[in-house]
Amino acid sequence: MKPLHLKLNNFGPFLKEEIDFSKIDNNELFLISGKTGSGKTMIFDAMTYALFGKASTEQREENDLRSHFADGKQPMSVTFEFQLNHRIYKVHRQGPYIKEGNTTKTNAKFDVFEMVDGKYEIRESKVISGTQFIIELLGVNADQFRQLFILPQGEFKRFLISNSREKQGILRTLFDSEKFEAIREILKEEVKKEKAQIENRYQQIDLLWQEIESFDDDKIKGLLEVATQQIDKVIENIPLLQVRSKEILAFVNESKETAIKEYEIIEKKTLENNILKDNINQLNKNKIDFVQLKEQQPEIEEIEAKLKLLQDITNLLNYIENREKIETKIANCKKDISKTNNKILNLECDKRTIDKEKKMLEENGDLIESKISFIDKTRVLFNDINKYQQSYLNIERLRTEGEQLGDELNNLIKGLEKVEDSIGNNESDYEKIIELNNAITNINNEINVIKENEKAKAELDKLLGSKQELENQINEEKTILKNLEIKLDRYDKSKLDLNDKESFISEIKSAVKIGDQCPICGNEIQDLGHHIDFDSIAKRQNEIKEIEANIHTMKSNIAVHNFEIKFVNEKISNINIKTQSDLSLEVLNKRLLENENALNNQRDLNKFIEQMKEEKDNLTLQIHNKQLRLNKNESELKICRDLITEFETLSKYNNITNFEVDYKKYVQDVNQHQEHSKEIEDKLIQLSQRKLIEQNNLNHYENQLETYNNDLELNEQSIEMEMSRLNLTDDNDINEIIAWRGEQEELEQKRDTYKKRYHEFEMEIARLESLTKDKELLDSDKLIDEYELKKGKMNTLIDEYSAVHYQCQNNIKKTQSIVSHINYLNQELKDQQEIFQLAEIVSGKNNKNLTLENFVLIYYLDQIIAQANLRLATMSDNRYQLIRREAVSHGLSGLEIDVFDLHSNKSRHISSLSGGETFQSSLALALGLSEIVQQQSGGISLESIFIDEGFGTLDQETLETALDTLLNLKSTGRMVGIISHVSELKNRIPLVLEVKSDQYQSSTRFKRN
């Protein structure tokens, strides 16, 4: 993120202020300077507040940011523009406040914009969602922003000196390590749940074990006394339980089967006795009913006689019924014949009417034929009528255009003749231009050679003069040097060395006294006075130094002048005087002018000839185009004339409109005539077809009538024969028999019922007699008592067996469930063992006594320290290195930082550092933290950093080192801004953002030193 523009309204000491960060060129290092309380830190607060709604330090609340001198009706707001990943964004945040005169607070506002195609487009307009949008956009929250972008006052060294718990809070926020703590809690809850599930499974096993039925059997009770916690013993006893349960079930089943057999015997005996009793009673009843049925025999015989007579007269009745049907058909057929004759007469009348219409239509046939002939002959004209119409319209225009084109063509031909006369025999001469150009170039070259030679001669004379001056200076300096060397040789340097022993002699004199033995020569000391004139020696020594300095100066001057002579000689050797023309410069200039004039004249002539040729070509092209247009005009005119001639010849019309009207009228008349003719023909065909159909119908009806008459005659003969056979003389006899037909169904039913019952009685009596023959009827009461006794015993044993069988099956299900629970429990214990171990390790129950979160944070801290030490080594002249304290205890430890002193080869507490050393360490650690967070976060773009702390504690050398470190950040493409009162920084940093205060408000401006 790189700041571009900051606008403050009623924010801290700034009532209305704008800061344009775009004035900072190439990510230049800049200083924010101002008096204490002027509002330097408020600039950082404004950026942090604009983005996150918080100040750059945790101690400042939002209410503390509003200016005390702000208008009560105006809100506090910050507008911040910044660049991120080559995109430009703008945020505008307005703080909540109670407007003067109101009692309720005006809500905060927050808008986020993005620049698209040179215009800002809104992205968010709500405080919460907008702040979340900024967090996701930057990839950091407010706390991370303070650590990465702004190192605020009072918090700069907080990370360095904080303990493990405090560092954990900082690192947890920066590296989002709470997810590892969440993992620990999840594992803890998972283990808790698993243990609860295991305990629940033990309870289920115990409950199932207690519910197993013992059948009051001592052996089973003994097996069930095993505790369910002994799951191996439970598994061992389950097969024994199943075997014993099967034995008990088999014993009960045997008793049940015996009781069932006894019950079935008495049940069968009772059933057979009851059946025999019922059969005897039924036999007696059927015999009585059979006697009563036989009494109806005479009546049935009379009914059968009537039914026989009805059966014999059936054919006669059918013939009589058929006669009635035939008579009805004959009557209907006669009606159809009459209707058909009437239809045929109507059709013949219609045909005569249509024949009259057809004759009238044929009388107009010749006129229609002439119209058809005209249409056929002129159809091609009508189909292309537009073509002929256009010919009439275009012929006059084409005549006029032809005359105009002829006149224009004649004018162009005359113009071409004039141009050809202007050109005459003249031709463009480009070879002459080339010759003149070559001559001019040669003359210019000769002139340039003369000028360059004159310039070279002047330069040579100047260099020779300089060389002579340098040689004279060298000779003078050599003479002076020789005199100085002679003067130096006159001094006795051996006596001058005593001056270096003055302090040594003074020490010896202070340590001895007269009469002592000299520690140098061994003689007795007679005098401690001055035997050597040290002042004179020092004076001569200064003179020698001065002479030696002058000698060194002379030698340097001689060497410099020799180098200058060498440089002059190289220049002289590089001067080249070329061979030049014998002609004078004046003659050459005169020839040059003559050739240039000749060249210009030839160019003008060539240009005129080319223009004339171009005009000739243009006129020739125009003549050609006019001729083409004229030819095209004549061709179109001929086509129009031919078309008009063709039209008038074929149509005999000279007017297109009249022709179109008559042609359409003829077509309409012909179409109407043809349609009418077709309509009449269709009607005649339809009438003919309808008459043919009706004639066929008439023939059909007449044939049917003849057939029906023949059928009626045959039917009458059959009736006479049947009456003769039945001895019937007239219709009265027949009608009497016909009256019985209404009772025929009832009579037949009565006869059939009698015969059916008679046969049933015979069969049933015979069956019952066979069932009761030779059988004895027993005492029913005794049999019933014995039956109930056996049945009760059987039901009791069946219920007992069902209960035992159900309990055995239930025991099997429960033991299977117990085995399943035990198997699942064993597998669960095996599977969850790793989770239990992992939960303990993550919770800190490991050889390092570290939770998973602290282990991760230690890894990140090691990375930060390694990165920080790269800069700290430079800033401390390779003396200090930050190290992590290795001592750990359970949970929150291992995050303290110590300093390792390479001079003493020992580590010590961070508090032992001086103020400047603490600043160096804090700065290095803060920059290392910033870079590691950027590496780990991926999406965070660190294009700027601001520092508000600590430069006043540094000496000059350390200050230079710290500034070099910050300048290196600039070279990596990051904007670096610092707040400091150190005056040296104003001279060291060229760009300064000055913050000035006039007691109630502040203002800012950029200036360069």
Swiss-Prot record:
Listed GO biological process terms: DNA recombination; DNA replication; double-strand break repair
Task: Write out the coiled-coil annotation as residue ranges.
Answer: 176-208, 264-364, 392-501, 535-776
The domain of life is: Bacteria
**Keywords in alphabetical order:** ATP-binding, Coiled coil, DNA recombination, DNA replication, Endonuclease, Exonuclease, Hydrolase, Nuclease, Nucleotide-binding
**InterPro entries noted in UniProt:** P-loop_NTPase (IPR027417), Rad50/SbcC_AAA (IPR038729), SbcCD_Nuclease_C (IPR053380)
The family database entries (Gene3D superfamilies) matched by this protein are listed as: P-loop containing nucleotide triphosphate hydrolases (3.40.50.300)
SUPFAM superfamilies, per database record: P-loop containing nucleoside triphosphate hydrolases
Q: Which residues bind ATP?
A: 34-41
**A Pfam family per the record:** AAA_23
Transmembrane feature ranges: none
- What Gene Ontology molecular function terms does this protein carry? ATP binding; ATP hydrolysis activity; endonuclease activity; exonuclease activity
The annotated subunit structure for this chain is: Heterodimer of SbcC and SbcD.
**Similarity comment:** Belongs to the SMC family. SbcC subfamily.
What is its biological role? SbcCD cleaves DNA hairpin structures. These structures can inhibit DNA replication and are intermediates in certain DNA recombination reactions. The complex acts as a 3'->5' double strand exonuclease that can open hairpins. It also has a 5' single-strand endonuclease activity.
List the NCBIfam families. sbcc_Staph
Q: What is this protein called?
A: Nuclease SbcCD subunit C
Origin species, per record, is Staphylococcus aureus (strain bovine RF122 / ET3-1)
